[in-house]
């Protein structure tokens, strides 16, 4: 029993021990299981994360693969972006520049248009300013001589004008050659015609009034330039726009010139443009005449020869004698050159004419000073009053000094150097005005030369110039007459031309054979110019006295017609010419020409028959002859006064012209 009990107890103890041991193992297994579960969870989470990462990586891989397939890397993308930005900036700046350029271009075009409009306005204003001035003078002054020399300012405007002026002259000359005598009368009308009260200035004439054209018209035959310049006016294309200085005797222009109406503008309105047609053909012939330029200009610029010196009054015989000797000394170099000494005298006279013409602009002031002038020159009231409108004889001491110097210089041959007293000064002025009634270019043609020697000087033609005669001063191509140089009386051109009305009035008592100035006033009808151009003879508005043979110069030389002086230049052309061609416009209807060798003839150098060929023969009208030849008529009167009178000096200046030019 005890043994069994003991055995049972033992068994229970062993069973409990075993159970405890198994429980411990179970607990250990459970713990391990829990740990494994945790690990599994951790691994699962990790696995999940890894899968997600794998997905992202795959996506990245795809993107990279796509980029590789596109061929652009990150750098390329950046570079491309930068390039795009730069291109955009460049394009924007370019557009801005284009806009600015467009704006500036528009502004420039606007400025150009405005400039053009301003230029047109200036031209129009100048035209308006130039036109009224000659018209204003119409009422107060008699028609000036057809050959008016420009004032010093005018000379500058003329010579400095661009070469275009010369080209225009050539074109006009060609036009004259083609149209012949059919050229519009407006181009042939002399300035007298334009200036006369009856005449009107056509608007279309504005382009024809360039200073170059005027210079060609006035100086195509005789070049009056500065001592240094060698180009003749015909050759000279002044560089529209600005003119060469006046070489003439007007060294210091008196204030009267400045205050007076500008001769340049006056000439623009009064000068026919056609006168410039001479320029192309005259240039070779004018070259010879240019040889006189230096001595002339040097003489003119000498302190003694200044016409404006107030001290030189015509009443002082010593001044007259001194200037006459100076003129002689100055004349010698030209004779050494083989050129006629008379030509220099002609230039002096022409310059004198220019000075008087400039003074003519002072007519109103001249009237005011007329009282002061009379004591000096002692001119009769009859002479003074006619000259006042022209302002030629009444300008005061300056003008008289000028005339004294010019008269003395006019003694180109030095043949008459006697001083002129106050009485002689009066006669000299009258003679100068008559001689230059119509300034006419000299005819250098052979026939003109021969005719000039034999021709009588029509005393009455001076005043009786028909408008045709005045207009024949219009340029005609020098084909037949060559460059037409004016005789000394003709050269006194402007001055004497301005005196012309005065002289005609004053000289009518002196020279009965000379018609009244009224006949010369008729020079300016435009209609007459048309008749001239068409070649139809114009009946002289006033009866023209028959040409009266003038007594030969005191030297015994008949005064050469202007044609004579021009003869050498146009020998070839003149052979074809017939005396008939010389018929003056006024005497055109009368046909006052005779054979060249017949002896004294009325050489009406201006002929419509020649038409354009005698472009320069503005003065080539019997009136111009009158200016020269009537001077001979006046010389008759003055010869009685005294062979040494200033008139003789002026009258004799042309006589040298005939022989020297014939020799040349």
UniProtKB/Swiss-Prot annotation:
Coiled coil: none annotated. PANTHER family: RBBP8 N-TERMINAL-LIKE PROTEIN, RETINOBLASTOMA BINDING PROTEIN 8. The lineage of its organism: Eukaryota, Metazoa, Chordata, Craniata, Vertebrata. Residues 516-528 have a biased composition (Low complexity). Residues 125-284, 369-664 are annotated as: Disordered. Residues 628-637 have a biased composition (Basic residues). Residues 481-496, 584-597, 654-664 have a biased composition (Polar residues). GO terms for cellular component: extracellular space. Residues 125-140, 437-454, 554-570 have a biased composition (Basic and acidic residues). This is RBBP8 N-terminal-like protein. It comes from Homo sapiens (Human). Residues 241-255, 537-552 have a biased composition (Pro residues). It holds the Pfam family CtIP_N.
């Amino acid at each position: 029993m005890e043994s069994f009990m003991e055995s049972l107890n033992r068994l229970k103890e062993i069973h409990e021990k075993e159970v405890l041991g198994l429980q411990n193992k179970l607990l250990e297994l459970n713990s391990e299981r829990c740990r494994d579960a945790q690990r599994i969870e951790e691994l699962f989470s990790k696995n999940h994360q890894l899968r997600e990462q794998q997905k992202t990586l795959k996506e990245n891989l795809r993107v990279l693969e796509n980029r590789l397939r596109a061929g652009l890397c990150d750098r390329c993308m950046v570079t491309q972006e930068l390039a795009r930005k730069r291109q955009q900036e460049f394009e924007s700046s370019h557009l801005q520049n284009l806009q600015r350029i467009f704006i500036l271009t528009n502004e420039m075009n606007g400025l150009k248009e405005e400039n053009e409009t301003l230029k047109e306005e200036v031209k129009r204003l100048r035209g308006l300013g130039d036109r009224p001035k000659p018209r204003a003078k119409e009422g107060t002054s008699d028609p000036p001589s057809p050959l008016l020399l420009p004032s010093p300012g005018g000379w500058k405007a003329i010579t400095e004008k661009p070469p275009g002026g010369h080209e225009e002259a050539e074109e006009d000359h060609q036009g004259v050659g083609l149209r012949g005598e059919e050229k519009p009368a407006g181009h042939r009308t002399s300035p007298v015609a334009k200036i006369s009260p009856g005449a009107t200035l056509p608007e279309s004439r504005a382009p024809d009034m360039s200073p170059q054209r005027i210079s060609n018209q006035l100086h195509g035959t005789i070049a009056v330039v500065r001592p240094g310049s060698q180009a003749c006016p015909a050759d000279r294309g002044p560089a529209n726009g600005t003119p060469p200085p006046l070489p003439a005797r007007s060294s210091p222009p008196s204030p009267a010139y400045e205050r007076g109406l500008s001769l340049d503008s006056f000439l623009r309105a009064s000068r026919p443009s056609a006168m410039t047609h001479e320029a192309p053909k005259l240039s070779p012939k004018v070259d010879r005449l240019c040889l006189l330029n230096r001595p002339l200009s040097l003489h003119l610029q000498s302190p003694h020869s200044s016409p404006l010196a107030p001290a030189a009054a015509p009443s002082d015989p010593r001044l007259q004698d001194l200037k006459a000797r100076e003129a002689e000394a100055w004349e010698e170099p030209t004779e050494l050159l083989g050129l006629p000494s008379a030509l220099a005298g002609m230039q002096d006279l022409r310059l004198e004419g220019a000075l008087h013409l400039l003074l003519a602009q002072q007519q109103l002031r001249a009237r005011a000073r007329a009282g002061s002038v009379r004591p000096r020159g002692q001119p009769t009231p009859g002479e003074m009053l006619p000259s006042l409108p022209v302002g030629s004889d009444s300008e005061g001491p300056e003008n008289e000094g000028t005339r004294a110097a010019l008269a003395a210089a006019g003694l180109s041959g030095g043949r008459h150097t006697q001083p002129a007293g106050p009485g002689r000064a009066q006669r000299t002025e009258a003679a100068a005005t008559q001689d230059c009634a119509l300034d006419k270019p000299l005819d250098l043609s052979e026939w003109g030369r021969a005719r000039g020697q034999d021709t009588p000087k029509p005393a009455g033609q001076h005043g009786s110039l028909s408008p045709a005669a005045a207009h024949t001063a219009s340029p005609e191509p020098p084909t037949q007459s060559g460059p037409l140089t004016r005789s000394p009386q003709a050269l006194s051109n402007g001055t004497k031309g301005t005196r012309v009305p005065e002289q005609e009035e004053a000289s009518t008592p002196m020279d009965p054979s000379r018609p009244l100035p009224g006949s010369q006033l008729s020079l300016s009808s435009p209609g007459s110019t048309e008749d001239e151009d068409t070649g139809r003879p114009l009946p002289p508005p006033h009866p023209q006295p028959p040409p009266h043979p003038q007594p030969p110069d005191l030297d015994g030389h008949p005064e050469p017609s202007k044609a004579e002086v021009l003869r050498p230049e146009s020998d070839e052309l003149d052979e074809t010419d017939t005396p008939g061609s010389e018929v003056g416009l006024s005497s055109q209807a009368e046909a006052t020409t005779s054979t060249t060798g017949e002896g004294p003839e009325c050489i009406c150098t201006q002929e419509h028959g020649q038409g354009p060929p005698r472009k320069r023969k503005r003065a080539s009208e019997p009136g111009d002859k009158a200016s020269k030849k009537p001077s001979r008529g006046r010389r008759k009167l003055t010869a009685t006064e005294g062979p040494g009178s200033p008139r003789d000096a002026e009258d004799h200046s042309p006589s040298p012209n005939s022989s020297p030019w014939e020799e040349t």
